[in-house]
A protein has these predicted regions:
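Active-site catalytic loop in hydrolytic enzyme cores
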Residues: 113-198, 208-221
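Acidic/histidine-rich helix-loop elements
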Residues: 20-36, 151-153
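CN hydrolase (nitrilase-like) catalytic-core segments centered on the catalytic cysteine
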Residues: 86-106, 174, 180-276, 291
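Short beta-strand scaffold segments in enzyme catalytic cores
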Residues: 107-109, 122-126, 166-168, 252-254, ...
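Beta-strand-turn-beta hairpins that frame and shape the catalytic cleft
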Residues: 2-16, 167-176
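C-terminal beta-strand edge segments of enzyme domains
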Residues: 234-349
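Cys-nucleophile CN-hydrolase/nitrilase-fold catalytic domain and related Cys-dependent amidase chemistry
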Residues: 31, 35, 39-138, 145, ...
Length: 349
């Protein structure tokens, strides 16, 4: 796209309550609860657009907005209870929201994959106003869930390199997705930015506070480093778990490419995190000859030399003898413990 076609529109980081499916006794009960959540989210989007105005063209939902996260369930149990099919009724209902309201809808959830029946992935999906899925990003760094990195060779065989850091060139700019705590990793955002991403849609469910938190600091940093917008939606509380409801609440925000917070929500379900996204601003900043143009000054070849020598978190750790392994409950903690021990042995930490 050229500057003459650079769009300006309103983006909404919808801070919605997450009603976790952990207490559900069967997959059928969980699916019914998820569909009820979609009905509620649809009503929240309708009310928000009616209040804000028809300029809303991008709505970002919180992380795992329909399910919450696994709390003691095995991989097989969580896959059956909470992971949805890419062509399932939940996706169809979300696509209808996007088409009915003429928006790009970004959402996050656990999903199945026919290539990996032993696993599930946490996916970020963007649906355009026609109801088509224009972006699917699978979370690459996760403490307690499988990721494409854990089965990297097999994943690349199935989907190719471009599936790792996808960028969608849309009518509202070039979009990419960052999942939850991945906002803390500069490389995740940067590898999207070097493929042209101008807007990071960030679905999260995180501890927030009036004080500076690591993730909130990171949102500003990722915007400044990459001269990109960050549209970050947090949960507006979570029910159905032993964790107090407001622990993952408040702080949904929109950050512009200069690191300026344009809008931010307080506690509870809220549509207050909405603001104008001006794609022309991002493009002007990226094409400006200036010290502040950090994206244009990145010595990527230099980084690549040193990164190639580094060995920290292993790839393919859910592969054994060419076969995908279903992770045991202790797998993720055991893996991190082994990484820490290896770093200590080498004198890195």
């Amino acid at each position: 796209m050229t500057d003459t076609s650079a769009p300006a529109y309103t983006a909404l980081a919808l801070q919605s309550l997450c009603e976790a499916v952990n207490p559900c006794k069967s997959p059928e009960e969980a699916r019914a609860k998820m569909m009820a959540g979609i009905v509620r989210i649809r009503a929240e989007i309708a009310g928000s657009i009616a209040f804000i105005g028809p300029e809303v063209k991008l709505v970002v939902l919180p992380e795992y907005a329909l399910t919450g996260f696994p709390m003691g369930e095995s991989a097989a149990e969580w896959r059956a209870k909470a992971a949805i099919d890419a062509d399932g009724p939940e996706f169809e209902a979300m696509a209808k929201i996007a088409s009915d309201f003429g928006i790009h809808l970004a959402w996050n959830g656990y999903e199945t994959d026919l290539h990996f029946p032993e696993l599930y992935f946490q996916g970020c999906v963007v649906i355009d106003p026609s109801g088509a899925q224009v972006l699917r990003y699978r979370r690459l760094i996760s403490m307690y869930a499988p990721s494409p990195y854990d089965v990297l060779d097999r994943y690349l065989d199935a989907y190719g390199e471009d599936a790792l850091f996808p960028v969608a060139d849309t009518a509202i700019g070039r979009l990419s997705a960052i999942a939850s705590e991945e906002i803390l990793y500069p490389e995740i955002a940067r590898l999207h930015a070097v493929k042209g991403a101008e807007v990071f849609v960030h679905s999260s469910s995180e501890v927030s506070s009036p004080l500076a938190t690591p993730k909130n600091i990171a949102k500003l940093a990722r915007a400044i480093e990459n001269l990109a917008y960050v549209v970050s939606a947090n949960t507006g509380g979570m029910t159905g778990t032993p964790i107090p409801q407001a622990s993952a609440d408040r702080g949904s925000k929109i950050v512009d490419p200069r690191g300026i917070i344009l809008a931010e929500a307080a506690s509870g379900p809220s549509m207050c995190a909405f603001a104008e996204v001006d794609i022309a601003l991002a493009r002007r900043l990226r094409r400006k000859t200036a010290m502040g143009n950090l994206l244009a000054r990145q010595p990527m070849a230099l980084y690549a030399r040193e990164y190639a020598k580094a060995d920290i978190h292993p790839e393919g750790s859910l592969m054994k003898d060419g076969e995908v392994q279903t992770p045991a409950k202790s797998f993720y903690r055991d893996r991190q413990t082994a990484v820490i021990e290896a770093l200590a042995k080498r004198g890195v930490i």
